Each structure stands twice: as C-alpha cells, then as structure tokens.
C-alpha cells in the first residue's frame, strides 16, 4: 500500500478552479492544493455558504484539500511596512484553509539571511512569530516553502521561533534549481518541520545569487536577463531530483502526507501532470 497520497495544484492546469478540480480527478489525483490570494479564491470573496459549496464540490469529485497556497508575492514578509496587511491577509487564508478542511497554508516568506543578526532576519522572525501563534490558535500550520536558502539556514530560522505553528512545505526542485542544496539531505535536516511537499523537478543551469533571483520574481526581470539561463523546471523524472531517494527519505522521517505536483511551465500542463501522477504511482 502506498505510503503517500498524490495531490496536484489545480492552478497548474490553468483552467479555473472548478475545471481544475475536475481535471485533478481525471488524472488520478487524491488531493488538491489551491491558490487563495486573489480573484475567486480570495478569502474576502468567499462567503461561508460559498466555502461549503466549494468543499462539497471537491468532495463530490472524490478529492480532499492537501493545502492552500497563500503566497502573497513580492518580497514575502521581508518589508516591515508591508507586513501588517500581509499578516492579516495570511490569517484570513488560514481561516479559509480550515473551512476547506485542511490545516496547511504554504507560502514563500522571502529570503532568510544566513546571519541571524541581519535586519531582515529579525523582520521575518517577527512576522512568523505572529503567524505561528495564530496558526497554533486555529489548529493550522503556516508552511514556508523551501528554495531561497539552504535547508540548514531554514532549520536554524525555524528553531529560533517560539511557535510550533510555522513549518515547511518541502519543494526539492527549488533547492536543486536555486541554491544547489542537496534535496535528499534536506529532508533529514528539516525532518521535524515538514508538513506538506511539492513534487517538482528541475535543473540548475548555472549558479546564481538566490537573493537576486527571488528579487526578480518580486520585481520583474531586468532587461536582457533570462531566468532560463540559471535554472529550468522539468517534467518529473527529467531533472536532477532523485525521486526514489527523496521518497525514501520522506518515509525514513515518518512523513505520510501529500506529494503535490506543481507544474509552473510547459505548453501542455495537463499531459505533464497526468504523466507526473503515473510517475509517482510507480515509485511510491
């Protein structure tokens, strides 16, 4: 019997939420993750009855919600003046997650510096302390996605927090593509914190500065700069993530949650996602 369940991010289909839910069922997924930051999934746009209707629609398609994506973009929580509004929005996203019967909200918080005396480190700590405390209150996890920093730097940051509500959404491809960190060893490093994962693959083309790369996501690309010169996302099994070793590591640490497929590029996402589901089913 498979240890893990397979999920998909419905937004990866690029067809809207309800159509994405249908497609998730069609490709054989057991769960879904949904972006909930704007548009039809913005918590401000979903009444209690809307939430019940959506949850019933998900259940009617034989699915559960593995997590909600609450990534608010920009520099995450790295700019203190922006954080009051972002923290309140993130709390509302956690409320929505609970209404949709999941306890995980995933996000990027910004690039955590290695130096704990860095001013940004303290700003991120303050935001995560408040969000972690709220997560504890409502029975949720606010899960930082791996990528901009090494697993060791992320672990040290998490260890510095007083709340147990801040955890990890483990994306092995982000580590491969941006920091060059070992995605297998990272599982063991972050073993006490992983509550959700993204099944994604990729390659690093050449080493770049993670600070600069994530600033490009936040602010847009400079002229004549191409992210493809630094890294490429690939279909599962075609990049540098050793998925059999990754899944073994997850089993070793006792993780029994979702492997949620994320496909952010490609001309035929439905085909790629369907093949990714089949790929994972063969190795779990």
Residue ranges and their predicted role:
Residues 31, 104, 196, 257-258:
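Residues at the N-termini of beta-strands
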């Amino acid at each position: 019997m498979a240890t893990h369940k397979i999920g998909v991010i419905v937004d990866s289909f690029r067809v809207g939420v309800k159509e994405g839910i249908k497609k998730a069922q069609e490709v054989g997924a057991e769960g879904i993750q949904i972006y909930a930051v704007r548009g039809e999934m913005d918590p401000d746009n979903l009444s209690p009855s809307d939430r019940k209707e959506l949850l019933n629609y998900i259940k009617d398609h034989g699915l559960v919600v593995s997590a909600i994506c609450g990534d608010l973009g920009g520099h995450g929580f790295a700019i203190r003046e922006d954080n009051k509004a972002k923290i309140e929005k993130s709390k509302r996203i956690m409320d929505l997650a609970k209404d949709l019967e999941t306890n995980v909200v995933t996000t990027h918080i910004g690039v955590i510096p290695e130096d704990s005396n860095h001013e940004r480190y303290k700003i991120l700590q303050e935001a995560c302390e408040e969000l972690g405390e709220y997560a504890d209150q409502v029975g949720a996890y606010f899960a930082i996605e791996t990528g901009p920093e090494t697993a060791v730097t992320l672990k040290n940051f998490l260890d510095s927090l007083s709340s147990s509500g801040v955890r990890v959404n483990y994306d092995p491809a982000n580590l491969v593509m941006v920091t060059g960190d070992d995605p297998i060893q990272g599982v063991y490093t972050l073993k006490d914190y992983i509550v959700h994962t993204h099944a994604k693959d990729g390659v690093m083309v050449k080493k770049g500065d993670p600070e600069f790369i994530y600033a490009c996501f936040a602010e847009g690309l400079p002229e004549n700069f191409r992210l493809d010169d630094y890294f490429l996302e690939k279909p599962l099994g075609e990049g540098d993530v050793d998925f059999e070793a990754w899944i073994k590591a997850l089993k070793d640490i006792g993780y029994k949650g979702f492997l949620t497929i994320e496909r952010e590029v490609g001309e035929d996402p439905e085909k790629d996602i369907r093949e990714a589901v089949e790929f994972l089913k063969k190795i779990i």
